[in-house]
Swiss-Prot record:
Residues 159-180 have a biased composition (Polar residues). Belongs to the thioredoxin family. DsbD subfamily. It comes from Vibrio vulnificus (strain YJ016). GO terms for biological process: cell redox homeostasis; cytochrome complex assembly. SUPFAM superfamilies: Thiol:disulfide interchange protein DsbD, N-terminal domain (DsbD-alpha), Thioredoxin-like. This is Thiol:disulfide interchange protein DsbD. The gene is dsbD. It is a multi-pass membrane protein. The lineage of its organism: Bacteria, Pseudomonadati, Pseudomonadota, Gammaproteobacteria, Vibrionales. Required to facilitate the formation of correct disulfide bonds in some periplasmic proteins and for the assembly of the periplasmic c-type cytochromes. Acts by transferring electrons from cytoplasmic thioredoxin to the periplasm. This transfer involves a cascade of disulfide bond formation and reduction steps. Residues 1-21 form the signal peptide. It comes from the Bacteria. It is found in: Cell inner membrane. NCBIfam families: PRK00293.1.
């Protein structure tokens, strides 16, 4: 899925990497010493602003041969509410420092509406630019004093142009651009595109092949194709009704998650919910294996039969309800694309736009299901013994879903064992039934070879884990965290770290967070990363239970979702723009923490 997402957003997302050697010791300028060809940053990008009514306009005059990065523009405020920021998109550019980016080579104007400003109101503007000749300036920060503005209707006359004061460099963040996480890349890449719904539609098609959505194929097939011989038109109608139920439910759930934040997301992924859904999938799988037959009470069957007789070929109401239920079942599978979609909705603040986008995402998930329902009878061979094999195969597919859900709350050893056991059972069954297949010759031999290779591939992860050498196991124990449970304990640890003059890393963790476990397995215990992390005071907040103190801590740190990692410098100050919200591989994570520790 990660590979699919990477391919899909390759043309949309901006990848940022560390800048190359920057900046000398010239105290009177922001440019590198030893080169007289570059002007100071204030001459390269003269920055001014003016205000009219309840709107402030920021103005950059870009010198010829220089450019500003669109991705490095950021605006934040204190004691004032900012409206929707209005600015034009930059032009695509290939930069030796940051790769494919959008830049501004002409004067740039940014309009920002403001309201409800209070005493001490400030607007903090951050930007960064480079010279085409191969030189990059550090990020610049300007603070605009809004408190002097009148909090009421002003005359239409434009105020005199003013120059914002630079932020004190002792507290300003002058780090190089931070690498974007997978979720941030998706959210930023989808923003401000009129064709966003089409992108979400394509993402939905990819999500249709994840472990939680794939088991919906046999369910839909039994609903639409299993109720009798249906025409293509009837099958198309019922499948569309099914997908509409799933899409509407998915859209509502997504909007609730985006508006309610992490609390609802955590509740939907609570261990009790995950265990309940896993039991449901196992129950369905056992019925596919013929252990028992699931059937409704006779009274309900009679009611459904009567309703089915009234609606020839199937119940649209029942199909819609099943689609809605499938939307609920699939909701805990918050893979990186779905998390990015929800992050996009939360950032946009436009529920209508967000609703349309998430509806398109769910419709994309339903497209493969519709194709199976409409063309299934033509694509599949005639009825025969193969149907029992297909039924058993779907049983194994159904068993993959509970493992996918439970690995969020199970130790890695057990999740690895479950995946290996499922693979061994599935490929062992395939090898057992190969001689009973209706075709023979080389096709039967190919099935046997696939089964044998699958058996070895399934057993290897468990063997690698259980028989790992002692050095690998010791490596896993190198990184240890100080556990914190609430805001008070966080403040205590920050105070102790400040006294020790050590930077701090706080990792928000939950058992149901897959990416949190990926951080733990692939990133934190990388030898180079583990060595660099020794310079930090490592804190971890386990919010699995989503208790009151967990919620208070998440709200205090303004955490919208997991994984989230925050950083403080050795002076106890939060490191601006250093937060990570999504999985990051060891190499870019190492660069990230090296910049912070240095």
């Amino acid at each position: 899925m990660r590979a699919l997402l990477t391919f899909f957003v390759a043309g949309l997302l901006v990848l940022s990497s560390p800048a190359m050697a920057l900046f000398g010791n010239n105290q009177n300028s922001s440019f590198a010493s030893g080169s007289n060809d570059f002007v100071p940053v204030d001459q390269a990008f003269p920055f001014n602003y003016f205000q009219q009514d309840h709107r402030i306009t920021l103005d950059w005059q870009v010198k010829e041969g220089y450019y500003l990065y669109q991705q490095r523009l950021s605006f934040s405020a204190e004691n004032v509410v900012l409206g929707d920021i209005q600015m034009e998109n930059g032009q695509p550019y290939r930069d030796e420092f940051f790769g494919d980016v959008n830049i501004y080579t002409n004067p740039l104007f940014v309009n920002i509406p403001m309201q409800d400003w209070q005493p001490g109101a400030k607007l903090i503007v951050q930007y960064q630019g480079c010279a085409k000749a191969g030189f990059c300036y550090p990020p610049e920060t300007r603070v605009i004093d809004i408190a002097s503005f009148t909090n009421g209707d002003m005359a239409p006359a434009t105020m005199p142009t003013q120059t914002a004061s630079p932020l004190d460099t002792s507290t300003a963040n002058t780090s190089t651009p931070q690498p974007l996480t997978q979720q941030d890349q998706l959210a930023s890449g989808l923003a401000d595109n009129w064709w966003t719904p089409l992108l979400f539609l394509a993402l939905g098609v990819g999500l249709a092949f994840t472990p939680c959505v794939l088991p919906m194929y046999p369910i839909l097939t039994s609903i639409v194709l299993g109720s009798g011989k249906l025409s293509q038109r009837r099958a198309l109608g019922l499948s569309l009704v099914y997908v509409q139920g799933m899409a509407l439910t998915y859209t509502l759930l997504g909007l609730v998650v985006a508006s309610a934040g992490l609390q609802f997301q955590a509740a939907m992924q609570h261990p009790y919910v995950l265990i309940g859904l896993s039991i449901l999938f196992v129950t369905l799988a056992l019925s596919m294996f013929g252990v028992y037959t699931l059937q409704l009470p006779s009274s309900v069957q009679t009611w459904l039969n009567n309703l089915s007789n009234k609606q020839q070929g199937g119940s649209s109401t029942g199909v819609f309800a099943m689609g809605a239920i499938s939307g609920l079942v699939c909701s805990p599978c918050t893979t990186a694309p779905l998390s990015g979609a929800l992050l996009y909705v939360a950032q946009s603040g436009d529920l209508l736009t967000g609703g349309v986008a998430l509806y398109a995402l769910a419709m994309g998930m339903g497209i493969p299901l519709i194709l199976v329902a409409v063309f299934g009878n033509k694509l599949l061979p005639k009825a025969g013994g193969w149907m029992d094999h297909v039924k058993t195969l779907f049983g194994f597919v159904l068993l993959a879903a509970p493992i996918f859900l439970l690995e969020r709350i199970l130790p890695e050893m057990w999740s690895t064992a479950l995946w290996s056991a499922l693979g061994i059972a599935a490929f062992g069954w395939l090898y057992h039934v190969k001689n009973s297949l209706e075709f023979g010759g080389w096709k039967q031999s190919a099935v046997g070879i696939i089964a044998v290779l699958g058996l070895f591939a399934s057993a290897q992860p468990a063997l690698n884990y259980w028989f790992a050498d002692s050095s690998q196991q010791a490596q896993t124990s190198e990184v240890s965290f100080i556990k914190i449970r609430n805001v008070e304990e966080l403040q205590q640890q920050l105070a102790l770290a400040k006294q020790a003059k050590k930077p701090v890393m706080l990792d928000f963790y939950a058992d149901w967070c897959v990416a949190c476990k990926e951080f733990e397995k692939y990133t934190f215990h990388d030898p180079a990363v583990a060595a660099q992390l020794k310079q930090f005071v490592l804190l971890q907040a386990d919010v699995t239970r989503n208790q009151a103190q967990d919620i208070e801590l998440l709200q205090a740190q303004q955490v919208l979702g997991l994984p989230t990692i925050d950083f403080w410098d050795a002076q106890g100050n939060p490191v601006s723009n250093a937060r990570l919200t999504g999985f990051m591989q060891a190499a870019p994570f190492l660069e990230h923490i090296q910049r912070i520790s240095n």
